[in-house]
């Protein structure tokens, strides 16, 4: 039996980060049945292989921005007689939609469902739906690092799942649950040591949690022995906690160079509308400065154009970047299926816009301010983004990276920002080419139109 595991192409080009589901699902497969031949495909790196792909079973992992190309790949493979299983957050949220393009859909986490999928396929009794449980994380296999080729330089390690925060825009809590589930620290160290190369990404939704700072310190202390450099996603609330400085010192000693922070909104009103104010803490600018004081570079991710935002928020974004000396990466607000934000924005959605537009580069809903038309929101988004990612600004930021991280953190700053800059330029060209068609869809408004595809 031959299995192909596929990650559909990203909207705006290739990334040096290996999609973690590929090598991890390969490890789950190898543990269940070592006789299965496995091939991995990241479609962003190998877009032209699917016409001639030969396998018995294809597994495709879907996010909302990759759902449409993922469905196209699935439809083409099924037309050639290849059985297709789909999973991931998008398929789990909309299983009936996904089933129209697949022989089976895995809803939820893979660990408990995937062995049953493989056994049923080999027995010729593949079921239409499989439901994975939110189980404990004390027996996860080490991903088959290195099985995926084609120049993916960074691997991702996960140490936890779940999130207690109630940010309205986020899919993590609906998919992984509100309880924080932690992996054994020695298992995390084992996976880090197995990664090829000397740098990796911690892919957790949050690398440090309020109330679990001691666990973060223990993890960072254990990782110090790997002598590898890393970056990860972290919230701001724990930074100013009583143990925050000790935690940051341990993180820096463990090789941490950069933290990606969900700034979420430029305005306080926007933060509260997203229910994200608890996550960022009471003094987020001081928290960012504290991170930098500990030698950790900071990249902020935030959204523009929500129904709570104003035109001034676009202009203020560049000021925040200059004032804090950080890189900033905006997107337009996306009400993903299954989120609370989706429910809130349902009456205002431009429902003619299918999932291919859910990339963070299009206005997807009506705005209460007549001045915030879809075209204005998009134009100002690109104006702001291209300014924040201008080559001069990228280079200037590199010289603001804490000196204690030289040279790795400075090289990493370029490796982080240059692919994003390239992707934004691709997005800008796509946007210009599609403007007329998108305006027609947006003009139909949020009522009386077809449901999003």
PLM regions and their residue ranges:
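Cofactor-binding loop segments of dinucleotide-utilizing enzymes, especially the Rossmann-like FAD-
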Residues: 8, 43, 89, 205, ...
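Radical SAM enzyme core and accessory elements
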Residues: 1-8, 14-15, 34-40, 53-56, ...
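Acidic, low-complexity intrinsically disordered segments
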Residues: 1-196
